[in-house]
A protein has these predicted regions:
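Intrinsic disorder and flexible/low-complexity segments
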Residues: 3-5
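Transmembrane beta-barrel domains of Gram-negative outer membranes and organellar outer membranes
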Residues: 14-180, 184-186, 195, 201-302
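Short loop-to-alpha-helix "cap/lid" segments that border enzyme active sites
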Residues: 189-191
């Protein structure tokens, strides 16, 4: 990862090429032209972008790390299917901090929409996303802990005509977080949180970019050995890394993430406020299933 970043930094930052329209879904389209894209990503790392994967396109992405919790594989993933140019259905892991204190993403199903505003230079694009949380259960002795987060996102994306290598992202995440204890202890609590989120993309060349994001996220807090009831607060999650398109339909990414306990951190703590960090490697695959089905069987054609 470091070698790729250094080589990219040595290269002159070229502007991103103008987005081109996908090849029409026709029976005579070549396989090479179908897989040439373009294939926009609908995410930074965990933050949604104001874009969808495109009509009749499926994307599968994931990343994992062994460093965040020694001896345990922590991972997150996304499966999205585009229907039309502005909508996609998805199953994904949304960011949250579990009672164990680590960034343990929670499963969710939802829909993401791009607001249909004509693309113009220096005019932001906007998107919304709704994610219905799926409960995740952790077991501590005879106590079951169930954590759920349901989210609504409003995000924006801005590209500059004079600096096409730079893309800014920002928005807000409205989360309804719930924690429930069962088994030998009974307790239930929920809280609504408004969480700002932001990020950026720096295009180093037409196939590689540096990506960063920072956001507040729900944090579940409970000590199984204590007598206090669980509570829901918020923590800060940041991530910085690269994304490299080996071919248009397949990208690799690597990133360094960190976690700050906002509730207990003092303004002058500096780096000591970081309570967790990790290194994650991942990939994203785009499958233009509509164009492939049209070429093979004459269905889903334009």
């Amino acid at each position: 990862m470091l070698a790729l970043l250094l080589s990219s930094l040595r290269a002159r930052a070229e502007p991103e090429p103008e987005p081109t329209k996908p090849v029409l879904r026709t029976r005579d389209a070549s396989l090479a032209s179908i897989l040439r894209g373009p294939f926009p990503s609908s995410r930074l790392f965990s933050m949604p972008a104001a874009d969808t994967v495109g009509a009749y396109v499926l994307t599968l992405s994931g990343d994992a790390s062994l460093l965040q919790q020694p001896g345990a594989l922590t991972s997150a993933g996304l499966l999205a299917i585009g229907f039309g140019d502005i909508a996609q259905l998805e199953y994904r892991h949304t960011s949250a901090i579990s009672v164990t204190g680590i960034n343990a993403p929670l499963p969710a199903v939802g829909v993401q929409l791009k607001i249909p505003i004509p693309e113009r230079p220096n005019v932001p694009a906007f998107g919304i996303a709704f994610r219905l949380g799926v409960p995740r259960t952790e077991i501590f002795g005879d106590t079951n802990v169930e954590e759920t987060v349901t989210d609504f996102y409003l995000v924006g994306r801005l590209r500059f005509e004079l600096a096409r290598w730079l893309t800014l992202h920002g928005g807000a995440r409205i989360s309804s977080a719930k924690i429930e204890l069962s088994g030998d202890r009974m307790f239930e609590s929920s809280r609504r949180l408004v969480l700002p989120t932001g990020g950026y993309e720096l295009a180093m060349n037409p196939t590689a970019k540096i990506i960063g994001e920072i956001a507040l996220a729900p944090q579940f807090m409970w000590d199984p050995a204590g007598t206090a009831d669980p509570k829901i607060d918020y923590g800060l999650l940041g991530r910085f890394g690269f994304r490299w398109a080996i071919v248009p339909s397949f990208t690799l990414d690597g990133s360094i993430g960190y976690q700050v306990d906002v509730a207990s951190a003092a303004p002058d703590d500096g780096p000591s406020a970081i309570v967790q960090w990790d290194i994650r490697l991942g990939a994203e695959v785009f499958v233009p299933w509509g164009a492939l089905a049209c070429r093979a069987a004459g269905v889903f054609c334009d």
